[in-house]
């Protein structure tokens, strides 16, 4: 998993999703909420149905966009964007002039989802129509939309916006343009303008400019980022530390000593998130002389700082690092012991392998999986191959992933093992095995992969099925003859899959399926109009009237009060509440924690592959990722299920990409619980 992309395994089953919604009804019927007239419920249901199926229903959208209730008009605008059909542009442009600002903002947001440059002139007009003192949500969303649309026209528009301000005098729109400029990419982003604003009087302006420069990895941004390490503003220091790295300094031909000195100072910063970012940045220099400054932080009171310190010591290496890490190998805290084992292996592969032998024989599969992570770090192929015989598929899958990383693609022995494991009972193992075969495509594997695809139809999640399609696509792309053989032995012989995700992947990797299987859209959601009316009546309408449901997440470190945002993601909230009512999440453990990024769970398997047996479509909304925001983890568009993540801090690069459906409330106490969670900690219960 990438640190920037929370991941959730892929699966879809319309029947299972329908069963979940039906099962929820008796419980949902008991929920309090503001009453809504049935006519409005019907309009909302029609919008939900069209959006969920990704079906451009012009009648439903027109009805919603012209509704007397502005909250309904806002829902219609969001639906138009989520459906993703460019035909919605003509419906949305007039809504930029709606009488209610929140509706205008939703229209701008939706136009950003559609990413069509035809909207840019109208979005610019919306921005310029008011004075700087009147700039609000519609103008800010218009800026974001322009950045998402991008291209040469979007870049020119953002440059014009930035030209309207100066480092000594900025506006909300200018600040928004600074924060969103990274979306343009390194070839179009206004690098010089971003650098100019890093010296702004207002800290809110400085950190936004630095954030985009950091995301762009722009050489011109290296010097401003180094200066930012000494900024009096905590957020600016944190952003600067996040953006610094050896590769960036090398590209700018800068001596790293000033940056390293600045990062070392931040190891004593009062803000834990700043210390974490500084540690992560120091790792990029792989300089063992900094180990002495890092060692004290392995005992930091903040679990995120302590684990990141271990991580960085493993990367920088050296005797001082290993001496500091060895006592951590006996820690009773899972997150601390796990990372210490991996870090020792990074610094001394032999010592790491020796330390992992004991956990590799542990009765608890979680520790055997950690052993696979350690052997991966040590590049211990023989140990990893031994783990392929583990009785638990979760361990086998992790070992096979490690072998995929460290063994050349054409290695005949590993390919032979992959062919055997393609018959394994665990879907995750079969998925990785198929991925291995895709790296070295050969026609000899066609029938084996077709059989794997057919077997995967019965799996509880669809990763193995998708991987088989990807591998067959790689074979088909290897030669015209291979394409013909795949078309004959797979495409023509296989009926159109119900799984939208399989159809979408096949359309991209196996062009012959476009004719044989028909169009990818619309999606068969498994829901009836009555189901959508139920969601609209029980969750969406009350939320539009100001009543949001809450769930309480009891952990080993305390309780998190989570407000569910049904007005932003009604179908997602309905599914989550059903899973909560079924006590689906009780007794699981946080399987992924990345310091100063996210905590993630919702996986009944506990290894990141699991899900509820169905997928839900994205409900991308304008809410931003701030501290304590709850989002749906994905492995690609429209692959949500039960896995969720909670952000430790603001993560603007996730905005508008992952569905936000909740937020931690309760102020500092909630944040304290969130920051205390370590990987492997238990989730005792999630309840209403």
Task: Locate the predicted segments by residue.
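N-terminal leader/linker segments that initiate helical-solenoid repeat arrays
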Residues: 29-78, 82
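Alpha-helix N-cap/helix-start positions at coil->helix boundaries
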Residues: 37, 55, 70-71, 86, ...
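Alpha-solenoid HEAT/ARM repeat scaffold
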Residues: 38-44, 74, 105, 136-140, ...
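Amphipathic alpha-helical scaffolding segments comprising HEAT/armadillo-like alpha-solenoid repeats
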Residues: 53-64, 85-97, 116-130, 151-165, ...
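Residue-level signature of alpha-solenoid helical repeat scaffolds
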Residues: 78, 109, 144, 160, ...
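Cyclophilin-like peptidyl-prolyl cis-trans isomerases
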Residues: 426, 444-688
């Amino acid at each position: 998993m990438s640190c920037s992309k929370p991941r959730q395994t892929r699966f879809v089953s319309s029947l299972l999703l329908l069963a979940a919604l039906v099962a929820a009804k008796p419980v949902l019927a008991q929920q309090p909420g503001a009453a809504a007239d049935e006519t409005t419920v019907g309009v909302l249901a029609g919008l939900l149905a069209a959006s969920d199926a990704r079906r451009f229903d012009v009648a439903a959208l027109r009805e919603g966009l012209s509704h007397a209730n502005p909250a309904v008009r806002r829902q219609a605008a969001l639906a138009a964007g989520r459906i993703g059909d460019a035909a919605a542009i003509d419906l949305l442009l007039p809504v930029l002039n709606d009488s209610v600002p929140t509706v205008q903002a939703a229209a701008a947001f939706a136009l950003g989802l559609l990413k069509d440059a035809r909207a840019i002139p109208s979005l610019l007009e919306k921005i310029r129509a008011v004075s700087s003192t009147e700039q609000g949500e519609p103008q800010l969303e218009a800026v974001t939309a322009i950045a998402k649309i991008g291209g040469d026209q979007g870049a020119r528009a953002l440059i014009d916006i930035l030209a309207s301000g100066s480092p000594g005098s900025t506006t909300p729109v200018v600040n928004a343009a600074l924060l969103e400029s990274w979306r343009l990419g390194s070839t179009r982003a206004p690098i010089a303008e971003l650098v100019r604003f890093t010296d702004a009087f207002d800290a809110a302006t400085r950190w936004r400019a630095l954030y985009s420069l950091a995301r762009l990895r722009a050489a011109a941004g290296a010097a401003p980022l180094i200066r930012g390490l000494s900024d009096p503003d905590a957020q600016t220091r944190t952003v600067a530390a996040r953006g610094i790295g050896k590769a960036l300094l090398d590209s700018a031909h800068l001596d790293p000593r000033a940056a390293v000195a600045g990062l070392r100072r931040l190891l004593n910063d009062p803000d834990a998130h700043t210390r974490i970012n500084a540690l992560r940045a120091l790792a990029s220099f792989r300089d063992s002389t900094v180990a002495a400054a890092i060692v004290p932080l392995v005992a930091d009171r903040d679990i995120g700082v302590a684990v990141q310190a271990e991580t960085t010591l493993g990367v920088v290496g050296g005797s001082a690092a290993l001496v500091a890490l060895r006592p951590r190998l006996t820690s009773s805290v899972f997150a601390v012991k796990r990372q210490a084992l991996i870090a020792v292996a990074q610094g001394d592969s032999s010592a790491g392998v020796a330390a992992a032998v004991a956990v590799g024989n542990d009765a608890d599969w979680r520790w055997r999986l950690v052993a696979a992570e350690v052997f991966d770090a040590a590049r211990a192929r023989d140990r990893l191959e031994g783990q392929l015989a583990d009785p638990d598929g979760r361990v086998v899958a992790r070992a096979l992933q490690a072998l995929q990383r460290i063994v050349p693609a054409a290695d005949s022995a590993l390919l032979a093992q992959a062919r055997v494991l393609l018959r394994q009972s665990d879907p995750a193992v079969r998925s990785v095995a198929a991925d291995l075969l895709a790296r070295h495509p050969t026609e000899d594997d066609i029938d084996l992969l077709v059989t794997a695809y057919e077997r995967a139809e019965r799996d509880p999640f669809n990763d193995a099925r998708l991987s088989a399609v990807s591998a067959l696509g790689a074979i088909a792309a290897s030669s015209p003859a291979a394409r013909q053989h795949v078309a004959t032995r797979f495409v023509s012989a296989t009926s159109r899959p119900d799984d939208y995700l399989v159809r979408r992947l096949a359309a991209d990797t196996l062009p012959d399926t476009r004719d044989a299987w028909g169009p990818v859209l619309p999606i068969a959601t498994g829901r009836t109009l009555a189901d959508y009316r139920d969601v609209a009546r029980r969750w969406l309408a009350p939320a539009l009237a100001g009543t949001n449901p809450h769930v309480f997440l009891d952990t080993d470190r305390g309780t998190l009060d989570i407000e569910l945002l049904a007005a932003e993601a009604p179908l997602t909230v309905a599914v989550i509440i059903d899973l909560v009512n079924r006590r689906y999440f009780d007794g699981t453990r946080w399987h992924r924690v990345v310091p100063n990024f996210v905590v993630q769970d919702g996986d009944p398997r506990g290894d990141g592959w699991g899900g509820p047996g169905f997928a839900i479509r994205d409900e991308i909304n304008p809410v931003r990722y701030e501290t304590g925001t709850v989002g749906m983890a994905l492995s690609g568009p429209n692959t949500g299920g039960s896995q969720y993540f909670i952000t430790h801090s603001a993560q603007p690069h996730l905005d508008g990409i992952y569905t936000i459906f909740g937020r931690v409330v309760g102020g500092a106490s909630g944040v304290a619980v969130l920051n205390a969670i370590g990987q492997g900690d238990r989730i005792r219960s999630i309840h209403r």
